[in-house]
Amino acid sequence: MSNSASPAVGRKLSWVTKLTYALLPLSFTMTTMVMTWQMIYYTQPLAISIGIVTTMLAVGKAIGGFITPIWGYISDRMYSTAFGRKVGRRKGTLLIAAPLNLIFYVLLWVPGMPVWYYLLVNIIYYGVYPGINTVVYSLPSEMTDDSKDRAQLVAVQQIGGGVGGFALSMFNAYLFKIWGADSWEPYFKIAMIYAVLGTVLLVIGALCIKERPYDETTDISSADKGSDEKVGFFGRLVSVFWNFLSVLRIKTFRNYLGIYLSQMTFRTVRGQINAYFIMFVLLLTPAEVSLSTGFSFLFGMVCVVIWATLITKLGGMRAYRLGSWFTIVLFVGIFILGLTHGSMPKATVTLVFTILITLFTLGNSGIVNAQTYVQSFVPDVDELVTGKRREGQYAGIQSTLEVIVNTVVTILVGVILQAVGFQSGADVKTQSPLVVNVLLYMYCGTVVVLALVGILLTYRMHLNEKTHDILVGESARLRNGGSMDDVTEETRKVVEDLAGMPYEKCWGHNNVINVSNKA
């Protein structure tokens, strides 16, 4: 049985395909608006207690996180439906998730509602949104096997996000200037603008993606069934969570996971309190928050091009280490600025911070691009282990972990700030010195410590361009009917090192997908 999805695997991707793929991360301006302004919107114009807001958001994200693995599971198995075989498994998932995301994104910003309303809407929103980012995360692996094309897709993804972030920051600065930032109306109007634009970009991007065709390796449902004719609801439920946990048996994924979590955590902490840091520590205005962020996004587009070139020359892990060391140096500088800004004119503080945060984009871009580049190779290890292409599985896990990290960070930030006496709705100059110091140490210290952790973990990661070529070659040999008995000694060693299990247990001779498989 065939499908109408546009296959790209096995040939070079055109730049038209790569640029239309950029529309998907460009649509993430909707999410950037939530991450940057939602907490401020709830605690400042709506004057809801920060303790209530952080608890509400944490619960919403946590419950949504339990739903997230289902999206990766569905996306991988969309070819088992007539709709999926007609439009494609990734494209079909996006076309289902996009309208749901629009509806609940709009409902997030409705003012004057009771707390239970915001809790419910946040739960549903954080349960729906992963249907989009699980697909976007999976596409570099889905669209091509070529390492250079994957590096370029990762770069295009980052540039798309950078363009969206810059446009949001500049546009927000302009709109806050003419509408003000003291009432709920400006936030609501801005959010509605991004709701429409983001959804249009998302749908157009979805219609243009390329993906793997329906064949033996993308027919995941056959592995789910095993010797059974049909998998029931309870069996599906068990399968979702078994697939979520069983990937930890794969050594490369475990190593990648530590690297991902370290950088994701420090970026989330910084993102959560970025506006508070600039407003309450540096005593700048909301417009200056957007402008500072905007400059970093603009410079980020240049940085992505630089890192895309460096990654192909240095490899993912060495590029990650370089970006991390650069980030550490810059945040030491930001820490010093936070301690000494009181003796500087406001214009000087704004200029110095803008320079430092813009330069941070160079380090952050290296970290994110290297991590995303390496992540695109993890499903190739999984294929050698399971005999199936499960890009959505790993994208779903990553989305779930993103929700979990956001949840934990949201709880901790709220608890810490409330414990030290943070005042919701207060003037920027009326926060206590303790609150200011806590924000300073959280903002800078978290980045420095976790960046060092990430550097140490990269030395445990053995998936590189050389071992990846060996891995992909072996998968292609087995896929084309080759015997596992004919494996070379070099290939066996590479496979066992990356998989973390004996070679004979690979290529589906395990229960990584199906817990009932006795092989």
PLM region descriptions:
Residues S2-K518:
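Membrane-embedded alpha-helical bundles of multi-pass transporters/translocases
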